[in-house]
Curated annotation (Swiss-Prot):
Belongs to the peptidase T1B family. HslV subfamily. This is ATP-dependent protease subunit HslV. GO terms for biological process: proteolysis involved in protein catabolic process. The gene is hslV. Transmembrane segments: none annotated. Keywords: Allosteric enzyme, Cytoplasm, Hydrolase, Metal-binding, Protease, Sodium, Threonine protease. The keyword Metal-binding applies. CDD domains: protease_HslV.
């Protein structure tokens, strides 16, 4: 699978992910780009799960963003609704983290749209719980930037989870 983590701190939101693509117990690729910018660079999105499925979902989500003038929550709810009810989409196996300058969300294939706890940290994928734990500890006990927390959290997840590597793609808003 993978690890995707998002941290929002001091007016900045950062989404990062590793680059490992696995097929069963074999690493197929080590430098996949699982975090992207959508909607003219105003929305960050990262995926965990099937790569082909995720690209389909990225395209659908970008269409929803266009349809709803970039309104993140409305677009996420509409995507989740379609994902849950459409026969073909229902078979897609992936999860998304999406974020803009105001909010961050997880979108799941069972129709859930999840907002973060008060700490504004989200994580998904096989290494998600490791990254989430690390990020929470770093937010509570350091003054590190959101980007530094994402980097360190992904490194910890990559050291523990066999389906996560340490080749990272990290995007942030506002751009630094």
């Amino acid at each position: 699978m993978t690890t995707i983590v998002s941290v929002r701190r001091n007016g900045q939101v950062v989404v990062g992910g590793d680059g490992q693509v696995s097929l069963g117990n074999t690493v197929m690729k080590g430098n996949a780009r699982k975090v992207r910018r959508l909607y003219n660079g105003k929305v960050l999105a990262g995926f965990a799960g099937g790569t082909a499925d995720a690209f389909t979902l990225f395209e659908l989500f970008e269409r929803k963003l266009e349809m709803h003038q970039g309104h993140l929550l409305k677009s996420a709810v509409e995507l989740a609704k379609d994902w849950r009810t459409d026969r073909a989409l229902r078979k897609l196996e992936a999860m998304l983290i999406v974020a803009d300058e105001k909010e961050s969300l997880i979108i799941t294939g069972i129709g859930d749209v999840v907002q973060p706890e008060a700490d504004q940290i989200l994580a998904i994928g096989s290494g998600g719980n490791f990254a989430l734990s690390a990020a929470r500890a770093l937010v509570e006990n350091t003054e590190l930037s959101a980007r530094e927390i994402v980097e360190k959290s992904l490194k910890i997840a990559g050291d523990i989870c066999v389906y996560t590597n340490t080749h990272f793609t990290i995007e942030e808003l506002p751009n630094s």
